[in-house]
């Protein structure tokens, strides 16, 4: 009995903590599916977590991780910002953003003299030609219908600018002429004439006389009033002399 029990105990495996079971092997399809899910689910963050796990498994990994974290801010931007890493799907918005930044330059159309004459002739008739007129004109001048339509749009804008400038200049000229006419028609008050100092001194000396005193040495031109006063004074003087002379002559009886 003892030998049989001992043999049974030797055949039974010993119970205790053993090594973990190995991971299941993945085929090529499983690897592709795992890589696809990996790239969609924030590739960069998951790679950092896996790298941190591998560093923790090695001795001295914490010191190396600290040194790498200290060098990363001073070293500049990470490689993930400069270029996509291996396995990262390129963003579809990068190419479109670069294309939007490069603004396409539109080719300008140069019209010759014959084309401009034909376009101006039609513009004199109508400022808004319909599609049939534009197509016919485009065939005549060897241009596209879109170019003809753009030319008419620009020509209408230029015509409106010229009209506004003409109206502004005309209104300014009318306002200027009206202000000049109003200034001419406004009555002007007569200015008082300045009195000469000779007249003021004469009125102060003889207030009752209306004729200024005659001065023989004056070189000014004689006025009619002054001549009349002089003649009256001379006549009076002669009459007085005649009366004196007649009174002195003795009478004969």
Swiss-Prot record:
One of its GO terms (molecular function) is DNA-binding transcription factor activity. Residues 61-70 have a biased composition (Basic and acidic residues). It holds the Pfam family Homeodomain. Residues 1-15, 71-84 have a biased composition (Low complexity). Residues 16-26 have a biased composition (Pro residues). One of its GO terms (biological process) is regulation of DNA-templated transcription. InterPro entries: HD, Homeobox_CS, Homeodomain-like_sf, OAR_dom, PRRX1/2. Keywords: Developmental protein, DNA-binding, Homeobox, Nucleus. The keyword Kinase does not apply. Residues 1-33, 55-113 are annotated as: Disordered. GO terms for cellular component: chromatin; nucleus. Belongs to the paired homeobox family. May play a role in the scarless healing of cutaneous wounds during the first two trimesters of development. This is Paired mesoderm homeobox protein 2. The gene is PRRX2.
């Amino acid at each position: 009995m003892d030998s049989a029990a001992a043999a049974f105990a030797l055949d039974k495996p010993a119970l205790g903590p053993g090594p973990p079971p190995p991971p299941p092997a993945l085929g090529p399809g499983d690897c592709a599916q795992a890589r696809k899910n990996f790239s969609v689910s924030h590739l960069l963050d998951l790679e950092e977590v896996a790298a941190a796990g591998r560093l923790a498994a090695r001795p001295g990994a914490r010191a190396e991780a600290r040194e790498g974290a200290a060098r990363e801010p001073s070293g500049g931007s990470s490689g993930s910002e400069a270029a996509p890493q291996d396995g990262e799907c390129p963003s579809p918005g990068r190419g479109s953003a670069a294309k939007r930044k490069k603004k396409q330059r539109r080719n300008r159309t140069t019209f010759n003299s014959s084309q401009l004459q034909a376009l101006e002739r039609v513009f004199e008739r109508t400022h808004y030609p319909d599609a049939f007129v534009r197509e016919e004109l485009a065939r005549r001048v060897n241009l596209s219908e879109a170019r003809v339509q753009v030319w008419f749009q620009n020509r209408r804008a230029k015509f409106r600018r010229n009209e506004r400038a003409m109206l502004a200049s005309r209104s300014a000229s009318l306002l200027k002429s009206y202000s000049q006419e109003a200034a001419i028609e406004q009555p002007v008050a007569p200015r008082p004439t300045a009195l000469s100092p000779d007249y003021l001194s004469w009125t102060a000396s003889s207030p009752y006389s209306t004729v200024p005193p005659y001065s023989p040495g004056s070189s000014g031109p004689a006025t009619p009033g002054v001549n009349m006063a002089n003649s009256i004074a001379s006549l009076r003087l002669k009459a007085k002399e005649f009366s004196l002379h007649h009174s002195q002559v003795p009478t004969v009886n």
